[in-house]
A protein has these predicted regions:
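Charge-rich, low-complexity segments
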Residues: 1-65, 82, 157-167, 171-173
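Long beta-strand-rich cores associated with HINT superfamily self-processing modules
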Residues: 53-173
Length: 173
């Protein structure tokens, strides 16, 4: 995305793109028979600042905040995930373009989370504001929600980011 001011990202872009993104996610969930469709509130400003502070390069640059607007489709089977990916292959027809994909099924995060993460932009947005969509197998959510694994993961992620920052400063002298 081309905007690097967090206030503009929130006030002008995130608030503008959230309604059409949410609509697209719900429609995609219906079309692909997702088990569950989740759209999140805007990422908190505190977490957004935390993310920009913890980046190694270009600290506090907000142009890398790609998940202020986000959603999730949950599928019973991997075939469902594949159906959503196929439908998103034609996302330009839905008014959106996939600009990045991370297959974290193949390589899970350090905390063990596995999904397919997609970044999309609305075709008519000349600011190229990026939204995030996660395609998730239902079994991943058992750990995250039913066993309260996400709270533990949040704590782990924040601690790991902080330790990485401290190590970086120590190595820099």
């Amino acid at each position: 995305q081309v905007v690097n001011r967090i206030d503009v990202l929130y006030e002008s872009l995130a608030l503008k793109q959230k309604p059409p993104f949410d609509e697209m996610v719900y429609r995609l969930g219906e079309d692909t028979k997702a088990l569950d469709t989740k759209v999140a509130p805007l990422k908190s400003l505190a977490r957004a600042f935390e993310k920009t502070a913890m980046t190694k390069e270009n600290r506090f640059d907000s142009d890398r905040l790609l998940d202020l607007v986000r959603g999730m489709l949950v599928f019973q089977t991997m075939e469902g995930v594949a159906a959503a990916l196929e439908a998103l292959g034609n996302s330009k027809d839905r008014g959106w373009t996939v600009v990045r994909m991370k297959n974290r099924m193949r390589k899970p995060t350090g905390g063990g989370w596995a999904d397919v993460l997609l970044n999309l932009t609305k075709n008519d947005d000349n600011q190229h504001f990026i939204c995030e969509l996660q395609l998730v197998h239902k079994k991943m959510l058992v750990t995250r929600e039913d066993l309260r694994g996400h709270d533990a993961y949040d704590d782990f992620r924040t601690a790991a980011e902080f330790l990485e920052l401290v190590q970086e400063k120590a190595e820099a002298g």
